[in-house]
Amino acid sequence: MEGKIRIEVLFPEIANLYGDLENIEYLKKSYPEVEVVETHLTGEPEFMKETPSLIYMGTLTENGQRLTVEKLSEYTDKLIEMINEGVYFLVTGNALEVFGGEIEDVDGSRDCGLKIFPTHAKRDMMNRFNSLYLGRFEGMDIVGYKSQFTHSSYGRAGVYEGNSIADLYGNFDRKRSAPCCGETFSIYR
């Protein structure tokens, strides 16, 4: 990122399920020169006026996912354009599912995503997956957790045989697909 760093936080009023916004607070305190703008569900995304250095979106409830898809659906072309231009995205938890094809419930009902990435998620609200990670990384103790109702896969069948993430996104045959790679779009769960 060159020049002034501008971070746009999408929908902080609903995309903060696990306190994800503290990531942004940490950045603001570590780098006071960073400008942080927030886009709320009731407003137009700031990225329509000025392209940010980074777009951040935190974990959502299932209804929050629906509201986010509804809101961002009219901006899909701009999102794809920004991905292709190398704008960085940091998306936490289940928010990535918003950018995928669909979220399928065990009862067969489906919520559509933005269809930017060729992912498919299966949701089972009666069986939450929880895990705790205790380990070390570069000499530091790490504690992490994972708590989710969904499991995502690439493509409908969850089978991918390419050589890289760039192959996956670059070869996704869709009229408005975004040939992008993991260098600009990051997630963690």
Give residue spans per PLM region:
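Hydrophobic/aromatic beta-strand patches that form the interior of the parallel beta-sheet core
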Residues: 8, 37-39, 90, 115, ...
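Short, well-ordered coil/turn elements that cap or connect secondary structure elements
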Residues: 2, 31-33, 84, 109-111, ...
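A broad, low-specificity signal for short, low-complexity segments enriched in glycine/proline
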Residues: 11-21, 51-53, 93, 97, ...
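Amide-donor transfer/coupling interface in amidating biosynthetic enzymes
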Residues: 2-3, 124-189
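Fold-independent oxyanion-binding glycine-rich loops
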Residues: 12, 39-41, 58-60, 92-95, ...
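A short acidic, often aromatic-flanked loop/helix-cap motif at beta-alpha or helix-coil junctions
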Residues: 43-47, 122-124, 153
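Cysteine-nucleophile active-site neighborhood
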Residues: 62-141
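N-terminal beta1-alpha1 cap of cysteine-dependent amidohydrolase-like domains
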Residues: 1-81
